[in-house]
Amino acid sequence: MNLQCMGIAMMKICVNRRRILIILLILSIGILTLLGISKYSFQKACLRREIRWPDLGIADDWQYEILTEAYKIKNEPNRKITITASDGVQLVGHYYERKKNAPVIIFFHGLWGNCYTNNVPIYRITEEKEWNLLLVNLRAHNESGGDVSTLGVLERYDCRDWANWVDFEFGEQVPIFLMGISMGGAVAVMSSDLELPESVCGCLLYTS
């Protein structure tokens, strides 16, 4: 009787072990799947990519208008600015001066956009108002360095670095406004809790 009970007990132990192993196997597969999905999502969302401008020959009417304006802006006389971010990444922007001591708009484009096509209406408005304009390439975009977009985590410090550059270059008497579209707008807002120059007067945001 004792041997029979021991045999039954051993069988139960074996069954329980198998169940535990199956559960552990399922959990391991689930974790590996989640890690794979996370890695894919990170690479798709955050790793640097080279995005070409759409071909004018196949653009629809709206795209054609935006692109032709963007090409004009790109070719307008401007001053190319390169600064070093707080983590050593080289950042590039283009400064368009309309009037000395006028307010400076620092513009940040959206994720995987560029400072020209994302900026056409703003460029024309600042031109009419004779405000000076600094078009910034976000890190991991276009002319700027960096391999990863951090979706605003590090970019907000870059925003502060650009504001500091404008303040140092033109003096604290020149008003600065931070402006962005989509993720660029988020970058401008996220930078507002940092120690910005006193010449920064506000944020102007736009999102679709």
What are the roles of these predicted feature ranges?
Residues 150-170:
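Alpha/beta-hydrolase active-site loop
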Residues 185-196:
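Short glycine-enriched nucleophile-adjacent loop
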Residues 30-83:
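An N-terminal hydrophobic leader/cap segment in hydrolases
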